[in-house]
């Protein structure tokens, strides 16, 4: 009997498909049933070959070899997942298999994952496509009843290949040209370089900003504070201090008369469910998690604990087929501290509405929500628990009723001038009951509501004090990882002067990068020492500034990505041949390399040290990495690097913040931002005192984490080994 191979993108999805398709026989990287064989990728198993794959002459980076444009580009199996590729290939090539169902993610990249595997395996069998937005049993069953011909998605595949090949052709050649021309480790690309340019633009705006003082007036009356409002502009501040000085003088001794009372019943609905970017923003804001860290923790909640749905989603809505599963999901999380809210929702009944259910706004995957898996909070690490809490509370909030309140606005007059105050009376906490109010209170001080006394129109109030308030306009805030993610998702503010069509295209296609790649892009900018962190703020380095002066202008603008997306969409729609687009990209690569070769600019290492590289003898560069300070060889091919100061997991005995380990050998010293300094030898003695309280498991776990965080030159881990606490 002939069988059908179903190719999923990940093992977890493969297991879901296998369960529905009754494939229970376990094999090496697959599950088999009477009719179907379900196997899976691990994301991409196949990729485009590096330049070295086209000949030994490309192992060395030389300007005269550029541009490198192989015909055609070759596919290679990714080494670290080669075992799974072979497992998939063995199923695809079975003689009893006469059909393939592509069940990877419903999108451009999902199509590429599957088709490249099939192409590299050299399989020529009929293809069907499973195109579903969620992996519930119902969705899978309906999807298999409506399988579509693979030919319908060939244009989508062509657009995916075009995107990948264009990124290779432009990225490889521009990076090698910059690195060899300027003898510095420089990299660029159509996503990372515009992202770097946005950081530089923000820094330039901050440096060019001139603060302007402003002034206002507050009047303290019985039971409340009134704020002066300009009658014409309706603003509560003026940039002319003469205005407030004159008013303070003229209004002395005057009473306030209530001219108007406006009472309005209002409702506030819960914020939308999380997509990956919004969750990364919130996790950074609440807990200081990096974008990469959030994705890593989220992946564990999804794959290991099975407590949340697919992480790499760009949708903040659910599809209608998920609604019948909501009760089971609620029951799975019916433990403290969520049980009381689950009980309220079940008692009230689950009411779906367009605030969180919208099929039109779900593409590949729906929003991140809890699964029906029973929640055991004690099995989660601190970070996992924090992230789950964000997801769980947002999920509960959208199922709760609206927050209802009555807003009262008081308009009073003092000596003919208008003063206002706002108050709020809560009628029903609704969804806000789920949250600690301190979490949600992001309002500016000027806008905060007061508890107002009982008032009537015409009431006269004694003015106790009149006070001038003042402040200064503030420059734009520097990016942190959360706000940078937002800018990447919506870069329109950095596209002034570009065609409206390009701005619109980027808005429709999700901005720079994807939800799955943005964290890696930011991490790459850190690891390339193009940006650095000071506290939570991101600064562009001297190297980053110089790179932007050296790269062609096109590569610095988000417009390049927008132009590509327009053409890739046309390829997917069958309106443009991919060969035409690739021909343009090859011409663009030639132009870019030529521009870099002919550049008269130079790159200056302003961070060069007097320390010679132990490998090649060239002077090393001092760079601030994401986790500490390093010495890096200026020769890219040497690649030697050494950590000289780094953030550790050792806590300051005074303020309990993480300390930095500085220096080399016996002179190594821990330093904390609070000013505490502690020699490594003193640290060892303190650890010895705690030895009786530290279990082998504690120390082993600690050292594993240290090695995972930063395996290079980890002096702290070495010293812990010497203490023998892990024996």
Curated annotation (Swiss-Prot):
Residue numbers spanned by region Interaction with DNA: 187-192
Keywords: DNA-binding, Isomerase, Magnesium, Metal-binding, Topoisomerase
Catalytic activity: ATP-independent breakage of single-stranded DNA, followed by passage and rejoining
Cofactor: Mg(2+)
Site note Interaction with DNA, residues: 61, 168, 176, 312
GO cellular component terms given for this protein: cytoplasmic replication fork
NCBIfam families on file: PRK07726.1, topB
Protein name per its UniProtKB record: DNA topoisomerase 3
Organism: Bacillus subtilis (strain 168)
Name of the gene this protein is made from: topB
């Amino acid at each position: 009997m002939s069988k059908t191979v179903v190719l999923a993108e990940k093992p977890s999805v493969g297991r879901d498909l296998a369960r529905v398709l009754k494939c229970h026989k376990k094999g090496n990287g697959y599950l088999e049933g009477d009719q179907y064989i379900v196997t899976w990728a691990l994301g991409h198993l196949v990729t485009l070959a590096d330049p070295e794959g086209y000949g030994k002459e490309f192992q060395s980076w030389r300007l005269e070899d550029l541009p490198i444009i192989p015909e055609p580009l070759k596919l290679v199996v990714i080494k670290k997942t080669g075992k799974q590729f072979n497992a998939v290939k063995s199923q695809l090539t079975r003689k009893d298999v006469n059909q393939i169902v592509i069940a990877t993610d419903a999108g451009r990249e999902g199509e590429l994952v599957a088709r490249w595997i099939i192409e590299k395996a050299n399989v020529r069998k009929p293809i069907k496509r499973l195109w579903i937005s969620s992996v519930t049993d119902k969705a899978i069953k309906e999807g298999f009843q409506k399988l579509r011909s693979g030919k319908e998605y060939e244009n989508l595949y062509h657009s995916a290949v075009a995107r990948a090949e264009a990124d290779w052709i432009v990225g490889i050649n521009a990076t090698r040209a910059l690195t060899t021309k300027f003898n510095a480790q420089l990299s660029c690309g159509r996503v990372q370089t515009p992202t770097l340019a946005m950081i530089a633009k923000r820094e330039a705006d901050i440096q060019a900003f001139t603060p302007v003082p402003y002034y206002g007036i507050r009047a303290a009356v019985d039971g409340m504070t009134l704020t002066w409002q300009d009658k014409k502009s309706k603003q509560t501040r003026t940039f002319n201090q003469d205005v407030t000085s004159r008013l303070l003088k003229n209004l002395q001794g005057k009473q306030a008369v209530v001219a108007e009372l406006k009472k309005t019943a209002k409702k506030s609905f819960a914020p939308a469910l999380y997509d990956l970017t919004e969750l990364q923003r919130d996790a950074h804001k609440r807990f200081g998690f990096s974008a990469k860290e959030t994705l890593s923790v989220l992946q564990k909640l999804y794959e290991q604990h099975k407590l949340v749905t697919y992480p790499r989603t760009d949708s903040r809505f659910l599809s209608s087929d998920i609604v019948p599963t909501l009760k089971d999901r609620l029951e799975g999380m019916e433990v403290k501290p969520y049980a009381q809210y689950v009980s309220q929702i079940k008692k009230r009944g689950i009411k779906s509405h367009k605030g969180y259910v919208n099929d039109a706004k779900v593409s590949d995957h729906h929003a991140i929500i809890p699964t029906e898996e029973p929640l055991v909070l004690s099995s989660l690490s601190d970070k996992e628990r924090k992230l789950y809490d964000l997801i769980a509370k947002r999920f509960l909030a959208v199922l709760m009723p609206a927050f209802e309140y009555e807003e009262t606005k008081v308009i009073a007059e003092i000596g003919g001038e208008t003063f206002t105050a706002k108050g709020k009376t809560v009628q029903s906490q609704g969804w806000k009951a789920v949250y600690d109010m301190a979490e949600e209170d992001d309002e500016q001080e000027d806008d905060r509501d007061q508890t107002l006394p009982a008032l009537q129109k015409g009431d006269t109030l004694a003015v106790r004090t009149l006070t001038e308030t003042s402040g200064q306009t503030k420059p734009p805030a520097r990016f942190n990882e959360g706000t940078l993610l937002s800018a990447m998702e919506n870069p329109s503010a950095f596209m002034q002067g570009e065609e409206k069509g390009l701005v619109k295209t980027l808005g429709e296609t999700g901005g720079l990068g994807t939800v799955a790649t943005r964290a890696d892009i930011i991490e790459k900018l850190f690891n390339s020492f193009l940006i650095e962190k000071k506290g939570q703020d991101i600064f562009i380095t001297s190297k980053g500034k110089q790179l932007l002066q050296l790269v062609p202008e096109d590569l610095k603008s988000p417009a390049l990505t927008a132009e590509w997306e327009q053409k890739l969409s046309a390829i997917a729609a069958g309106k443009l041949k991919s060969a035409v687009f690739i021909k343009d990209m090859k011409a663009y690569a030639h132009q870019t390399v030529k521009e870099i070769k002919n550049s008269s600019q130079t790159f200056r290492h302003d961070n060069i040290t007097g320390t010679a590289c132990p490998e090649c003898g060239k002077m090393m560069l001092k760079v601030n990495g994401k986790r500490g300070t390093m010495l890096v060889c200026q020769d890219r091919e040497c690649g030697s690097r050494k950590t000289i100061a780094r953030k550790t997991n050792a806590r300051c005995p005074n303020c309990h913040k993480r300390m930095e380990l500085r220096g080399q050998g016996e002179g190594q010293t821990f330093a904390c931002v609070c000013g505490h300094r502690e020699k490594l030898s003193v640290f060892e003695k303190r650890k010895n005192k705690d030895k009786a309280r530290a279990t082998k498991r504690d120390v082993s776990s600690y050292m594993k984490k240290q090695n995972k965080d930063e395996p290079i030159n980890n002096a702290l881990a070495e010293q812990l080994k010497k203490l023998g606490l892990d024996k």
